[in-house]
């Protein structure tokens, strides 16, 4: 039974779970659909290996052949989870990564870390650097495998950031979504089959929408589970930490994924339609920008708004931010962003785009047909080589005016258009879609 949020704002609370911490995010947008103690720190156990694999993919070469060192074989507990590598064994980085993500091979993480990071200490530095780049503020990693260390911790939110970054790497998703991997023979062992330990991909608790994930368990960490799932075009990532048992962590994850799939709806801006994505600006009527098949200023069609089913979108708050630091290029130039929030929750965003499809007319033609009280002609043509303007030696002034053009484009071209059209228009379009959906 779904309950309303304790704040009374109508946002659904979601199911009760036994894990002490959890979060579900939309994998494509990063929007948070459910959370429980998502900033509380826990030990991640083997869910650490998501970061290990991501760092190896970004910094290593899958075809490299590594040799398992004495340290990799012996400095990791022989009774912990392993893929079966021994000292002197030679495997490719790719084979080791399958062993890490499927069999949770601790010795494989050490071997990969030594190879990719030049030393295990160097690799751990790469792990912490990557976590920081992703915005993980409550995490620190002391090893590559996740076996207990007091200085090795994270939280559900940070782990979701790591999992989402990994989701954006196609090779990672290929590995984590593999149920069985045929490991070829090596110089030490015969060929064998590696089996994914995630029960949603294999075993009696198979979940039909699961596309990957990682398990984790130690005495101190309890039971942790990260799951990737896809249903009806929605891609979700669930993170559950510090659950009492394996059965509990899988039951929690299934509940959360089913809840979010069934009670949230998403709308992509490109579902609205091309004409409704554009809005007027003074550039549409400028003779300096002739024959524009696309609008000069528009919103990106790739943005997505995600809300609970039946939610009143008109209650959302709209925030517009502009970016004047860009360098104009042909094609789409991101010049701002619209963010939709509900309370403290971000429910969607989309980019404001300046479309630079072609060079303007010549300065001479522009002067003849464009009123002088509009944008100054020298500002419009500030990106043109000064020598072509007949004013050699004024390159610095031209560059200054080029920057001014960008600021004018923002202030004149989209200042009113964005506020009037997008802020009200997109809300109205989504509201109309919701009404149609409810009538069905």
Kindly label every feature range from the protein language model.
Residues 30, 54-57, 338, 391-395, ...:
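Polar low-complexity intrinsically disordered regions
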Residues 46, 260, 429-430:
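Short alpha-helical segments used as structural interaction elements across diverse proteins
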Residues 412-420:
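Single-pass type I membrane protein transmembrane segment
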Residues 422-440:
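C-terminal membrane-anchoring or membrane-association module
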Residues 43, 372, 389, 426-427:
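A general, composition-driven signal for non-globular sequence regions
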Residues 1-157, 161-175:
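Active-site-adjacent loops and short helices of periplasmic peptidoglycan-processing enzymes
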Residues 136-137, 150-153, 157-158, 163-413:
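Domain-terminus/edge residues, biased toward the C-terminal soluble/receptor-binding domains
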Residues 36, 332-335, 435-437:
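Intrinsically disordered, low-complexity sequence elements enriched in Ser/Thr/Gly/Pro
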């Amino acid at each position: 039974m779904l309950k309303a949020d304790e704040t009374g704002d109508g946002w659904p609370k979601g199911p009760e779970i036994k894990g002490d911490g959890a979060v579900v995010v939309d994998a494509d947008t990063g929007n948070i659909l459910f959370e429980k103690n998502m900033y509380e720190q826990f030990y991640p156990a083997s869910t650490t290996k998501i970061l290990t694999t991501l760092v190896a993919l970004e910094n290593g070469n899958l075809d490299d052949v590594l040799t398992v060192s004495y340290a990799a074989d012996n400095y990791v507990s022989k009774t912990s989870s392993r893929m079966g590598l021994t000292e002197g064994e030679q495997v490719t980085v790719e084979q080791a990564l399958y062993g890490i993500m499927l069999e949770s091979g601790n010795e494989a993480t050490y071997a990969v870390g030594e190879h990719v990071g030049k030393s295990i200490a160097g690799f751990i530095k790469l792990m912490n650097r990557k976590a920081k780049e992703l915005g993980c503020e409550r995490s620190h990693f002391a090893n590559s495998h996740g076996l207990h260390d007091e200085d090795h911790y994270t939280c559900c939110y940070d782990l979701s950031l790591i999992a989402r970054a990994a989701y954006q790497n196609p090779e990672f998703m290929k590995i984590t979504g593999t149920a069985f991997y045929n490991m070829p023979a090596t110089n030490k062992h015969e060929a064998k089959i590696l089996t994914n330990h995630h029960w949603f991909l294999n075993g009696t608790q198979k979940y039909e929408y699961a596309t990957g994930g990682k398990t984790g368990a130690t005495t101190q960490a309890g039971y942790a589970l990260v799951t990737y799932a896809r249903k009806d075009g929605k891609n979700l990532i669930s993170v559950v930490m510090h659950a009492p048992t394996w059965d509990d962590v899988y039951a929690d994850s299934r509940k959360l994924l089913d809840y979010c799939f069934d009670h949230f709806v998403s709308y992509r801006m490109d579902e609205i339609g091309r004409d409704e994505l554009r809005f007027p600006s003074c550039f549409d009527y400028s003779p300096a920008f002739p024959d524009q098949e696309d609008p000069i200023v528009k919103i990106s069609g790739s943005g997505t708004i995600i809300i609970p089913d039946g939610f009143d979108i008109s209650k959302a708050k709209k925030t517009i931010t502009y970016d004047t630091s860009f360098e104009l290029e042909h094609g789409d130039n991101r010049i701002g962003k619209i963010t939709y929030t509900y309370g403290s929750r971000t429910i969607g965003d989309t980019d404001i785009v300046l479309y630079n499809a072609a060079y303007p007319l010549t300065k001479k033609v522009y002067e003849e047909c464009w009123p002088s009280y509009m944008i100054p002609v020298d500002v419009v043509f500030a990106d043109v080589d000064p020598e072509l303007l007949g004013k050699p030696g004024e390159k610095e002034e031209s560059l200054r005016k080029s920057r001014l053009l960008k600021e004018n484009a923002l202030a004149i071209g989209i200042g009113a258009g964005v506020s009037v059209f997008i802020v009200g228009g997109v809300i109205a379009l989504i509201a109309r879609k919701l009404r149609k959906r409810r009538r069905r």
